[in-house]
Design a protein with these regions (language model features):
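Non-heme di-metal
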Residues: 1-177
Length: 177
């Protein structure tokens, strides 16, 4: 039987969206509870949010939406492109027409962020496709994301000499201060 175009596929998409939204709402609710001094209630909201995340993942997998990293990066870039070129542009225009100038400006601001997200995903995709995630053409400072070990080289170590974590834990060190 074919899932594509079925009522079950539509139900899976609705379930995924609902569980995803619930997860975010409960995370926000936890923040409020914590600020108001209700640690236990905050923890329960967070625990439930984690449950909702797993429910969403289950439905997302059933939809066949989880690919390999390159496929996921491309999918993410395409989604971000839609958000900044179409969705938020339309939302900003409509908000402006209805007199919600502050919201229109926020939609445009988020659109600019979504554009940067698309660019980041496309750069990461290029790195994956060109096998440049852990190897660069020039001397680069690499940092182990687990223990903080720093090493200079054109390639990240196969294994961290300090904590023995694999190469996958290394990233190009970037300072922003």
């Amino acid at each position: 039987m074919e899932l594509k175009g079925s009522k079950t596929e539509k139900n899976l998409m609705t379930a995924f969206a609902g569980e995803s939204q619930a997860r975010n709402k409960y995370t926000y609710f936890a923040s409020v509870a914590k600020k108001e001094g209700y640690e236990q209630i905050a923890a329960i909201f967070l625990k439930t949010a984690d449950n909702e995340k797993e429910h969403a993942k289950m439905w997302f997998k059933a939809l066949g939406e989880l690919g390999n990293t390159a496929e996921n990066l491309l999918h993410a870039a395409e989604d971000e492109n839609y958000e900044w070129t179409d969705m938020y542009a339309t939302f900003a225009k409509e908000a402006e027409e209805e007199g919600f100038t502050k919201l229109a400006a926020q939609f445009r601001g988020v659109a600019a962020i979504e554009k940067a997200h698309e660019e980041r995903y496309r750069a990461l995709l290029s790195n994956v496709e060109m096998q440049k995630v852990f190897e660069k053409g020039e001397m680069t400072m690499w940092e182990c994301r687990n223990c903080g070990h720093l090493v200079m080289g054109t390639k990240a170590p196969e294994v961290c000499p300090v904590c023995a974590h694999p190469q996958s834990y290394f990233e190009v060190r970037g300072e922003n201060y």
